[in-house]
């Protein structure tokens, strides 16, 4: 699990942004332009570190467009991202830090480190496994396989003169024996699953016959492998029944769904009560298809370690939003979730777990995150739902 995240001089997060502790379920509320989506953008950047870091940088308008624009001294800021994540194989969590700036309109990495979160009793500083070291990268290579990962024992510090200045070390070193900590962080971040928007128009990938050579283990960001994921989930004990039970909460007449493979493509069909032939996904309403996508995420028995969803309430009838809240709580026992929402109905469904809600606001120094505290809300919640308290303006995260 991601224990904390700290963003500085990045997008709407200013230079004095503090490390923010994360829980299994984190539902962000706040007005438009407060920075909720920027947190997920930052996680998308981290996800790219074991692959091509420049891809999201380019898609976001170039390196300079990722930098905090609130400075008044005229200097080019240095953006930094720092996360602490659990490391079951080691003795303590790992801290990963990445910092970059702009040089001649190009991204320039100025710092990167992977180290233990805390110092141990015998050290003045945390054991490190990689450090950028002011442009002279150092790797702490494991030379004795008998020593536990996360330990400084049995290590040899080696320079890395040919490291790229535009790509993370996570994309350049992946030996699980020699660099177990780097391999673990890279694999973990690479599995982060982001779902920022689904295009569900008439001729979009989730509706049309889909390629059979796409991955089927988890839903892609554009939902282009929806049929393959459903086909995989159908083979898992009890999962199809769970999907159908939840789907009927919105689509009461549905009796079953099936997947057909024809001519090298795959398509999803729905069997509706009273109809003699199935209905293809091309004929489903946008809301029904969106809900089905959400179900594949939230009912999955073996999801990725972190799943991010932007505004799951879009296109759905308000009556089904309490079910989304229930599904979020259930899914958070299997994975970590970061979700954004503008729905007071969805927030009301979290009244029993108000500590899962994070208020996001834009202040003079940038985006500020603040988690609700259950004890401080007990009197309010004895009379109102959490969504009602939010709309009253007692939680923050309101426009006025």
Give the ranges of each region predicted by the language model.
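C-terminal lobe/lid and adjacent interdomain/linker elements of RecA-like ASCE P-loop ATPase modules
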Residues: 1, 323-400
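N-terminal pre-Walker A segment at the start of P-loop NTPase domains
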Residues: 1-16
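Phosphate-binding P-loop
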Residues: 17-23, 299-302
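Phosphate-binding glycine-rich loops of NTP-binding sites
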Residues: 24-62, 112, 291-295, 340
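Conserved ABC ATPase signature
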Residues: 31, 225, 238, 245-299, ...
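Conserved P-loop NTP-binding catalytic core
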Residues: 40-108
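Conserved catalytic network of the ASCE P-loop NTPase/AAA+ motor domain
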Residues: 72-74, 89, 299-302, 329-333, ...
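Electropositive, glycine-dotted interaction segments
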Residues: 90-245
